[in-house]
Each structure stands twice: as structure tokens, then as C-alpha cells.
């Protein structure tokens, strides 16, 4: 009864997972983040046949979107920093929003140039999914936690999206046709950027789940090997039978080693291709937290009213960062599980073939030690969350210092320079 219930739960989670992934794929297609078509029979993404003319038009379209977005960033950020610069704190917020806009353009261009490589990595993930299903003899790989984390991340993304895009629908942004077109382009590019940023989180989550399934498969294999070493008369085997089983288990371990190697390489390829987007993901959410805190303090000082929306959005952006760090840390931890297993103890010195497979696999794990590093600067793990929190606290002290020294007060010098 329990196994039947677990099977139904696994099937339901797999159905939901496929539905959500298909929905994300269609959103990416609609936003032109992906131009590949999905072959459902082979479970692979195929590049659409494009002539040189279509490719030129695609590049031209990207350039137009980038130029329009770059020209519209004052309007896009006016809801946060205001339409006039009156204080030194306003200048600081302006510099922060400008840096986000510049990185958004860079992320957009890099993503457009690397679409073919991104498609290849996605196809390798899809091939690994099928290969792990065969090796582990499982029909459903995506557990309920995949659906939970996916929906949780989607909720935070939609909260931030509504908060950032709703101000663009003010009447002042639709006074003439040029502003209407510009607003539409800005929303289009921002949604495409958010889609790519969510893919960063999703890739690490999928890698972690695949690593977890492979680790569980090795644990189950070691459990099945226990009768080989058993001294109980009821389970004792002939030497020939032991050698036969150990050869089979050695072949199974070799296949696991091959999958671990491919999973290591595909995770690193994913990280390398999207490392600028991952950096932008971290920077965007961090700067948004800073801007929300700035907006909160500004309203508190000027209007004597507390804007709780700013605080809520700051926590939403922090949750985005925490989810990314947790998924990256989860992937690394799951990749190291086999090192903690007694592979070199179970059935050691009983068969040379098995001993060699274990030695090769453990050596491979030592060589292919997974580290999720962005641009060689920092590791994505749970410890990085503490670094982000300390940076936010430091920024709060800077804001407090600005307030004490009159940084939030209107300055004639600033007004004269930016009017």
C-alpha cells in the first residue's frame, strides 16, 4: 500500500515537473530567449533552420531592443529613485540603477550570442536524464521538492516582476506612440532577462537532483552487495557466483562513474556559459535590496510614513539570492556523497576487477571535484549568504551615515548639476 502510494506521488510530481518545464520552455520561446524546437520523441532541442537573412534580422532585432532599453533606463528606474536628483543619496541610487541597466544589456547580448552553446548544454541534460532513468531503473526522477522549489522561485519572480513592471503602466508612459513602443520593448527585454536568470537557479536544482539519484543508486547497490560478504550459511555463495556478481557490480559502478563524469562536465559547462548571468542574478537582487532599503528610509525621513512594500520586496530579493545559493550548495554536497560511502571497504580484496573499478571511481571523484565558482571570484554556497548579509548591513550603515550627515537632504549643488 505504501509503495503504491509513493509511486502515485512520484508520478504526480513527475507530471507536474514536466508541465512546469514545458511551460518555461514555451515562455522562453515566446520571449525569443530560445529559438530551438523540441523533439518530444527523442527528447532533444533542435536548432531551427535559418538562412543568413533570418540570422541577420535576428541580430538586428536584438540590437534594436538593446538600444531602446538603454535609452529608456531613466524611465524604468524613476519609480524607485524619483524623476529629479536632489540629494547625494539620489546620486548613489542613480549609480546603482545605472549599473543594473548596463549589466542587463551585457547579459542580454551574451545570452543572444551563446544560444547555440546553451542549447547543447540543455540537450546534454536531457540525454543524462534518460541515461540515469535507465541506470537507476526509475521512471520518475523529479521529486516533489522539485515542484515545491520551482513554484516557490516562480512566486518570488512574479512578485518582483509585478513590483517592477506595474509602475511602467502609468498614464505618463503612454502619452505618445514612441513612449508606448519604448515601454513595450523595455518590458519585453526585462521579462526575457528574468527568464534567463530563473534558468540559472533551475540548472543547479536539476543537477543536484540528478546527483542525489546517482548517490542513492550507489547506496542501493552497496546494500545489494551485502550477501556477498555474508558469513551466514543461508546466504553463503560459491566463489564462482561471488566473482560473477562482483563483475556485474563492477560494470554497474563503471557506468555510474561515466554518468558522474558527464554530470560533472555538463554542470561545469552550464556554470561557464551562464556565469555572467549568474553574476547579474546576484548583483541585480543585491542592488534591488539596497534600493528598497533606500526607498524605505527616504519615505520614512521625508513623509514620516513607513512603506512596508519596500521591506517586503527587500525580503523577496533576499529570498531569490538564498534559493540560488542553497541550490548551488545542494548540488556540490550531493556530488560528494559517494566519497563518504564505504566503497573501498565493501568486498575489498575479493575480486581484482571490482577493486580496480572502485579505485578508478574514487580517483575520478578526487580529480573531478565540483566547485561552482563565478568568474573565479567567489564560490556559490551557503557561506556566501552570510557575505551578502554582511554587505547589506554595511550598506545600511552607509545609509545611516548619509542620514546623519544630511545626505538625504536636498542639495543646491546636486540640483544645479543635474537640472
UniProtKB/Swiss-Prot annotation:
Q: Does the keyword Endoplasmic reticulum apply?
A: no
Can you name one GO molecular function term for this protein? taste receptor activity
Annotated transmembrane regions = 56-76, 91-111, 146-166, 185-205, 278-298, 306-326, 384-404
Annotated GO biological process:
chemosensory behavior; male courtship behavior; monoatomic ion transmembrane transport; response to caffeine; sensory perception of taste; signal transduction
Q: What happens when the gene is disrupted?
A: Disrupts fly aversion to caffeine.
The membrane topology term of the UniProt record is: Multi-pass membrane protein
Per UniProt, the keywords (alphabetical) are: Cell membrane, Membrane, Receptor, Transducer, Transmembrane, Transmembrane helix
Ranges in the topological domain labelled Extracellular: 77-90, 167-184, 299-305, 405-419
Q: Which domain of life is it from?
A: Eukaryota
**Subcellular locations according to the entry:** Cell membrane
Q: What is its main location?
A: membrane
| A cellular component annotation (GO) from this entry | neuronal cell body
Q: Which residues lie on this side of the membrane: Cytoplasmic?
A: 1-55, 112-145, 206-277, 327-383
Annotated InterPro entries: 7TM_chemorcpt
Q: Does the keyword DNA-binding apply?
A: no
Q: Which tissues does the record link to its expression?
A: In larvae, is expressed in neurons of the dorsal pharyngeal sense organs.
State the family it belongs to: Belongs to the insect chemoreceptor superfamily. Gustatory receptor (GR) family. Gr93a subfamily.
**What is known about what this protein does?**
Gustatory receptor required for response to the bitter in taste neurons. Gr93a cells respond to bitter compounds such as caffeine. Flies avoid bitter substances, suggesting that Gr93a neuron activity is sufficient to mediate avoidance behavior.
The protein in question is named: Gustatory receptor for bitter taste 93a
Question: Which species expresses this protein natively?
Answer: Drosophila melanogaster
Amino acid at each position: 500500500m505504501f509503495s503504491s502510494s509513493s509511486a502515485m506521488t512520484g508520478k504526480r510530481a513527475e507530471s507536474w515537473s514536466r508541465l512546469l518545464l514545458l511551460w518555461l520552455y514555451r515562455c522562453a520561446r515566446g520571449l525569443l530567449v530560445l529559438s530551438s524546437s523540441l523533439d518530444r520523441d527523442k527528447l532533444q532541442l533542435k536548432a531551427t533552420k535559418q538562412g543568413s537573412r533570418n540570422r541577420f534580422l535576428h541580430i538586428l532585432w536584438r540590437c534594436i531592443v538593446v538600444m531602446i532599453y538603454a535609452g529608456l533606463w531613466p524611465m524604468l528606474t524613476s519609480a524607485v529613485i524619483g524623476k529629479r536628483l536632489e540629494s547625494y543619496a539620489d546620486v548613489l541610487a542613480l549609480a546603482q540603477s545605472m549599473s543594473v541597466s548596463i549589466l542587463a544589456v551585457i547579459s542580454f547580448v551574451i545570452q543572444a550570442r551563446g544560444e547555440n552553446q546553451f542549447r547543447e548544454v540543455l540537450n546534454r541534460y536531457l540525454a543524462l536524464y534518460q541515461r540515469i532513468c535507465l541506470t537507476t531503473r526509475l521512471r520518475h526522477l523529479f521529486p516533489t521538492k522539485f515542484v515545491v522549489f520551482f513554484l516557490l522561485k516562480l512566486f518570488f519572480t512574479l512578485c518582483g516582476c509585478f513590483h517592477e513592471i506595474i509602475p511602467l503602466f502609468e498614464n505618463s508612459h503612454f502619452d505618445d506612440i514612441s513612449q508606448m513602443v519604448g515601454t513595450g520593448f523595455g518590458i519585453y527585454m526585462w521579462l526575457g532577462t528574468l527568464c534567463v536568470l530563473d534558468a540559472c537557479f533551475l540548472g543547479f536544482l536539476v543537477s543536484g537532483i540528478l546527483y542525489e539519484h546517482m548517490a542513492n543508486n550507489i547506496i542501493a547497490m552497496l546494500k545489494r552487495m551485502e550477501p556477498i560478504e555474508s558469513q551466514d550459511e543461508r546466504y553463503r555463495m560459491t566463489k564462482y557466483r561471488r566473482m560473477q556478481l562482483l563483475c556485474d557490480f563492477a560494470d554497474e559502478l563503471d557506468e555510474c562513474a561515466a554518468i558522474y563524469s558527464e554530470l560533472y562536465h555538463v554542470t561545469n559547462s552550464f556554470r561557464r556559459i551562464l556565469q555572467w548571468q549568474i553574476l547579474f542574478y546576484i548583483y541585480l537582487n543585491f542592488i534591488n535590496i539596497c534600493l528598497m532599503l533606500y526607498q524605505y528610509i527616504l519615505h520614512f525621513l521625508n513623509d514620516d510614513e513607513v512603506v512596508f512594500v519596500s521591506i517586503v520586496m527587500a525580503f523577496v530579493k533576499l529570498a531569490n539570492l538564498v534559493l540560488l545559493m542553497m541550490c548551488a550548495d545542494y548540488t556540490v554536497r550531493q556530488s560528494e556523497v559517494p566519497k563518504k560511502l564505504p566503497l573501498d571497504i565493501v568486498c575489498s580484496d575479493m575480486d581484482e576487477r571490482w577493486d580496480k573499478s572502485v579505485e578508478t571511481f574514487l580517483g575520478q571523484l578526487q580529480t573531478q571535484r565540483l566547485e561552482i565558482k563565478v568568474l573565479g571570484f567567489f564560490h556559490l554556497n551557503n557561506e556566501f549568504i552570510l557575505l551578502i548579509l554582511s554587505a547589506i548591513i554595511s550598506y545600511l550603515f552607509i545609509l545611516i551615515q548619509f542620514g546623519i550627515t544630511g545626505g538625504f537632504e536636498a542639495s543646491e549643488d546636486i540640483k544645479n548639476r543635474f537640472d
